[in-house]
């Protein structure tokens, strides 16, 4: 039932929005139009030092994110004596809203700053995480739940800024025919490492 709106939107998009030509906006390069096998994709990605660093960055971000998410509901229950519904729904709504805003903000800022310096796609999320850490500590040490909720907004927003620029880096490392596989591999590695 919860996925029904997404299915409806997907059907509407399929009916009314044309599929863009793959790679139409990419600069013409020596990339092949053939779709590589999974083995070829993994071999290509493993050769890329930039991709390996990206996996490490995504993994550390995943560990931090999964840890905080696993911790927050119990923390809100014990520290502020909220009910389970108040803690889980409140944190879920806040995290969902700040996550969406953080992804959009991170992507937009990286694109803007990246016009002058392509390295912005990497250093912007790194700086955001460095700023977020002490702000998260500040928020979690508040004794008043309202102040905690207000103060946690910024680190929660900053946390997800890595997603847009990070996937952009990954997609720019490979041919258009490898982008979905690259995304899946990056997400699988960082998720598995983050959950372990």
Predicted regions and their residues:
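Alpha-helical transmembrane segments of MFS and MFS-like solute carriers/permeases
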Residues: 43, 52-61, 94, 135, ...
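Paired intracellular helix-loop junctions of major facilitator superfamily
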Residues: 114-116, 170-179
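Juxtamembrane intracellular "pre-TM" segments in multi-pass secondary transporters
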Residues: 21-55, 79-82
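C-terminal transmembrane helical hairpin of 12-TM major facilitator-type secondary transporters
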Residues: 116-166
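C-terminal membrane-cytosol helix-exit motif in multi-pass small-molecule transporters
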Residues: 3-27
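Extracytoplasmic gate region of multi-pass secondary transporters
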Residues: 48-104, 158-167, 194-195
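Helix-to-loop junctions at the C-terminal end of transmembrane segments
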Residues: 102-118
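Loop-to-transmembrane helix entry/capping segments in MFS-fold secondary transporters
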Residues: 84-88, 176-186
